[in-house]
């Protein structure tokens, strides 16, 4: 199975979550968490930190990631590892391809599939963090 990751990046004050706005399919026009493909021979944390830096410019020195959960999609022959962390300091975002933005956690319906990618999974992930913490 091909491995992928998505990374939940909370702002330093923990009031906002970092998203990219998809410019093409899958999920064109929707907000998605940053992340990408796990390369052969790469472990999950290496891949998560690499993708985070490639897509946002956020380096290891600015955040500590925890491995929160995994999704296995047998019908798509892939797995998605979910990582979460809170920034230690303010950062300048450097988008790789898709525009980046901070979305407030309070009052946002992350289950809204007309706005957010993932068929409601982002809402599930945010709820898991709110209920059980960041790991």
Regions found by a protein language model. Give the residues of each.
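Short histidine/acidic/glycine/proline-rich micro-motifs that form metal-
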Residues: 38-39, 71-72, 109
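Nudix hydrolase/Nudix homology domain
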Residues: 26-30, 94-135
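Conserved Nudix-box catalytic region and its N-terminal flanking loop in Nudix hydrolases
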Residues: 16-54
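Conserved N-terminal beta-strand and adjoining loop/helix that marks the start
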Residues: 1-17
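Active-site segment of metal-dependent pyrophosphate-handling enzymes
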Residues: 57-91, 116
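Short, well-ordered beta-strand micro-motif
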Residues: 9, 82-86, 104
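Short, charged/polar surface micro-motifs in flexible loops or helix N-caps
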Residues: 12-16, 26-27, 39, 76, ...
């Amino acid at each position: 199975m091909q491995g992928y990751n998505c990374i939940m990046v909370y702002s330093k004050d923990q009031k906002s979550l970092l998203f990219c706005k998809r410019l093409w399919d899958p999920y064109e026009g929707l907000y998605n968490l940053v992340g990408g493909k796990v390369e052969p021979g790469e472990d999950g944390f290496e891949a998560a930190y690499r993708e985070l830096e490639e897509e946002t410019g956020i380096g290891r020195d600015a955040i500590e990631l925890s491995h929160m959960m995994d999704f296995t999609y047998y019908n798509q022959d892939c797995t998605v590892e979910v990582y979460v962390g809170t920034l230690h300091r303010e950062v300048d975002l450097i988008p790789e391809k898709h525009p980046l933005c901070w979305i407030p956690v309070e009052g946002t319906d992350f289950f809204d599939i007309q706005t957010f990618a993932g068929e409601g999974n982002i809402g599930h992930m945010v709820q898991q963090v709110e209920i059980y913490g960041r790991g």
